Amino acid sequence: MPFLDKVKQQYEDWTRITPSNLLYDRALLLLFFVLLLIGLLAVSSASIPVGTRLFKDPFYFAKRDAIYVFLSCVTCYLCVQVPMEKWEQWHVRLFAFAIFLLILVLIPGIGLSVNGARRWIPMVLFNFQPAEFAKLALTCFLASYFTRKYDEVRSRKLSAFKPFALMGLMGLFLLSQPDLGSTVVLFVITFGLLFIVGANFWQFVGLMAFGGLLFVWLVLSSAYRLKRFTGFLDPFKDPYGTGFQLSNSLMAFGRGEWVGEGLGNSIQKLEYLPEAHTDFVMAVVGEEFGFLGILVIVILLGLLIFRAMKIGRESLLLEQRFKGFFAFGISFWIFFQGFVNLGMSLGLLPTKGLTFPLISYGGSSLIIMSMTIGLLLRIDHENRLMRIGQARLRDD
């Protein structure tokens, strides 16, 4: 089709490696900025009622989110300046620091407890969530480990025990908060990288079965988790109890229909939908911008994930395994977290405290996610330099 051919040509022109755009992936950077701006707009609208009630300022959270967006852009820029070899050298220190933070947050008087969960460390501008840093640290550690043990992981049956044991250590501290959602994200990152590495088939199947059984046990062993897990099956059975969040989220999507009620016209955000600007921000987006608004965000995030996976594939083709595994780990992380958040809001999955990447309100989530974008830009930059160097050698 001529139209699709034209779109494809425009995309190839935009992302082609030429001296004028050698330094960065323009498509990835544009997607990053657009999602940040959409997130700022969504949070500004969704947080008006709660900002008015708590601080007598309807734009209290919007102002703070604008600060987080600025800090995220600065963080992304700083990460682009750091060579990937430094991250590979720091993988053990990053992992150890993440464990330290996960222990620190559990100490009474240091960790901030909200709704029975101790997940945050109070800081000047925001409450830092160590779980977000743990995801980045584990991804970096696994990328380095699988680079060094590549042949061993592909051939030996028990070679994945060490990375899963270390992931389990992080998971143990996360479950103590409790934070099952972040624990599952760590498992998905680990499992996804094992798939990319090409781990032994039976080892792969065994770990998947073990992870599934462990998840079932964790759900069944806690009455609170079991209620949340079963509540999504029929949220209207107990609309003022376990199904309160989900029933209001579904009503928000229902009111939005195809094109939404318009910016600022959400009814469910008026104290009916808890966490409207954080975990359930997509429900407010669905109510105000409808199915088409949700579709646009999903497409944008999908394109960002596609770029991340393409960068990972290019790294592996250039035999840069650490960069490739790091990029793939980031793509699995972003995909799964976005999938779970949207699925949770739509009632397809149990409610979990996972933010939607680059959209939901939260300083820790935005800044750490922006670090991953900076890392992807750096990996792509180094890949481009390497390919240009190889091309010049062939020409000579």
Curated annotation (Swiss-Prot):
- Report the pathway entry: Cell wall biogenesis; peptidoglycan biosynthesis
Give, as one word, the top-level EC class: transferase
Q: What is its main location?
A: membrane
Record's GO cellular component terms: cell division site; plasma membrane
Question: What is catalyzed by this enzyme?
Answer: [GlcNAc-(1->4)-Mur2Ac(oyl-L-Ala-gamma-D-Glu-L-Lys-D-Ala-D-Ala)](n)-di-trans,octa-cis-undecaprenyl diphosphate + beta-D-GlcNAc-(1->4)-Mur2Ac(oyl-L-Ala-gamma-D-Glu-L-Lys-D-Ala-D-Ala)-di-trans,octa-cis-undecaprenyl diphosphate = [GlcNAc-(1->4)-Mur2Ac(oyl-L-Ala-gamma-D-Glu-L-Lys-D-Ala-D-Ala)](n+1)-di-trans,octa-cis-undecaprenyl diphosphate + di-trans,octa-cis-undecaprenyl diphosphate + H(+)
Q: Could you give a single Gene Ontology term from the biological process aspect?
A: peptidoglycan biosynthetic process
Q: Give the molecular function GO annotations.
A: lipid-linked peptidoglycan transporter activity; peptidoglycan glycosyltransferase activity
Report the PROSITE patterns cross-referenced here.
Answer: FTSW_RODA_SPOVE
Hey, which stretches end up on the Cytoplasmic side?
1-27, 86-93, 144-157, 307-323, 377-396
- Taken from the record's topology, the Periplasmic segments are 49-64, 115-122, 179-183, 226-285, 345-355
The answer to whether keyword Methyltransferase applies is no
Q: How does it sit in the membrane?
A: Multi-pass membrane protein
The UniProt record lists the EC number as 2.4.99.28
User: Localized where?
Assistant: Cell inner membrane
Keyword terms of this UniProt record = Cell cycle, Cell division, Cell inner membrane, Cell membrane, Cell shape, Cell wall biogenesis/degradation, Glycosyltransferase, Membrane, Peptidoglycan synthesis, Transferase, Transmembrane, Transmembrane helix
Q: Does the keyword Ubl conjugation apply?
A: no
Ranges annotated as spanning the membrane:
28-48, 65-85, 94-114, 123-143, 158-178, 184-204, 205-225, 286-306, 324-344, 356-376
The similarity comment for this entry is:
Belongs to the SEDS family. FtsW subfamily.
Task: Please give the PANTHER family that the UniProt record associates with this protein.
Answer: CELL CYCLE PROTEIN, PEPTIDOGLYCAN GLYCOSYLTRANSFERASE FTSW-RELATED
Q: What does this protein do?
A: Peptidoglycan polymerase that is essential for cell division.
What is the official name of this protein in its record?
Probable peptidoglycan glycosyltransferase FtsW
Q: Which organism is it from?
A: Pasteurella multocida (strain Pm70)
Gene name, Swiss-Prot/TrEMBL: ftsW
